[in-house]
């Protein structure tokens, strides 16, 4: 499919488009097609014109994904700063048509925020602070977008995305928007089941009212803690592995003597062992090889099989 096959589009469509600059590792091949929608309604128009069997890949901040050097078949959709609506909503109107009752999500002294998938978690955290919602400050520690946070139940500083979620909007391949509630999904540590070929396009988050100054203090303290313990400013994806029950992946990797271990131009961070860095011109193959090496070595030393938190996609 070429650009000539589409009409009414207000977004930007590219063919054979390099993807490395859209990922926090700065690696990866090309997308056969790459679309940046103008907004949610433009995205709907685009999807209705795609073949029903077109492979779709959704990309936000690109911070929890490793795209292989061979690139991605089908169409990649970039939500970052495109699905960007962020607002306080009337809690009594949220999902009323689904529940059949006006008080399905009554306020009860809380604030409900609707954030679209392309909003960064950092922006959501700052918005929470501006509203005096201290319990939303933990989103500042998640290096991704709302869509990605919903898809993997991302967390930081003891907080988890789905603990704050009261509802979501999803979109299917035909561009139809569905409103769904948390009980329709199986929520796990860094894993969410139940999308069934749909994609998160917005979340409704419920927070307690609080003092704006206390909320600002909380977010600053959390960011200071993160900056002291993580290699901020380096090319990485954040945490590579999930923490196993009762332990920490970083502790296991460090105690296995793997800090500073390199393959090609990929390196296990000296500052935080659960981060793998692109030292400048690493390939996706370098990083994937190092991920497998770390997992195998930790298994040999500790007898624990680390589970990847990062998603590896695309063609080798």
UniProtKB/Swiss-Prot annotation:
The gene is murB. HAMAP family: MurB (MF_00037). Its EC number is 1.3.1.98. Keywords: Cell cycle, Cell division, Cell shape, Cell wall biogenesis/degradation, Cytoplasm, FAD, Flavoprotein, NADP, Oxidoreductase, Peptidoglycan synthesis. GO terms for molecular function: FAD binding; flavin adenine dinucleotide binding; UDP-N-acetylmuramate dehydrogenase activity. GO terms for biological process: cell division; cell wall organization; peptidoglycan biosynthetic process; regulation of cell shape. Belongs to the MurB family. Residues 27-225 form the FAD-binding PCMH-type domain. Cell wall formation. Its cofactor is FAD. SUPFAM superfamilies: FAD-binding/transporter-associated domain-like, Uridine diphospho-N-Acetylenolpyruvylglucosamine reductase, MurB, C-terminal domain. The keyword Flavoprotein applies. Pathway: Cell wall biogenesis; peptidoglycan biosynthesis. GO terms for cellular component: cytosol. The active site is at residues 190, 239, 309. It is found in: Cytoplasm. Coiled coil: none annotated. It comes from the Bacteria. It catalyses: UDP-N-acetyl-alpha-D-muramate + NADP(+) = UDP-N-acetyl-3-O-(1-carboxyvinyl)-alpha-D-glucosamine + NADPH + H(+). The keyword Cytoplasm applies. This is UDP-N-acetylenolpyruvoylglucosamine reductase. Signal peptide: none annotated.
């Amino acid at each position: 499919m070429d650009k000539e096959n589409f009409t009414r589009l207000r977004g930007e469509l590219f063919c054979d488009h390099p993807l490395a600059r859209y990922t926090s590792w700065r690696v990866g091949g090309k997308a056969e097609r790459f679309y940046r929608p103008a907004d949610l309604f433009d995205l709907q128009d685009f999807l209705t014109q795609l073949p029903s069997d077109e492979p779709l890949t959704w990309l936000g901040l690109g911070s929890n994904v490793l795209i292989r050097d061979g690139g991605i078949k089908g169409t990649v959709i970039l939500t970052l700063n495109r699905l960007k609506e962020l607002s306080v909503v009337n809690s009594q109107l949220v999902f009323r048509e689904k529940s059949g009752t006006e008080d399905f999500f009554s306020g009860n002294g809380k604030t409900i925020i609707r954030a679209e998938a392309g909003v960064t978690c950092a922006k959501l955290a700052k918005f929470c602070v501006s509203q005096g919602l201290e319990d939303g400050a933990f989103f500042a520690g998640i290096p991704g977008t709302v869509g990605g946070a919903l898809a993997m139940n991302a967390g930081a500083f003891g907080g988890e995305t789905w603990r704050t979620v009261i509802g979501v909007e999803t979109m299917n391949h035909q561009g139809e928007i569905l409103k769904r509630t948390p009980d329709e999904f199986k929520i796990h540590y860094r894993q969410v089941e139940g999308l069934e070929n749909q994609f998160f396009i917005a979340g409704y988050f419920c927070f307690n009212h609080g003092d704006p100054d206390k909320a600002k203090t909380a977010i600053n303290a959390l960011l200071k803690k993160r900056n002291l313990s993580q290699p901020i400013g380096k090319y990485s994806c954040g945490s590579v592995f999930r923490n196993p029950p009762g332990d920490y992946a970083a502790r296991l990797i460090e105690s296995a003597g793997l800090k500073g271990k390199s393959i090609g131009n990929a390196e296990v961070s000296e500052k935080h062992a659960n981060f793998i860095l692109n030292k400048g011109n690493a390939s996706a193959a370098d990083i994937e090889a190092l991920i497998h090496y770390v997992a195998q070595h930790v298994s040999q030393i500790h007898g624990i099989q680390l589970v990847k938190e990062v998603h590896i996609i695309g063609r080798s």
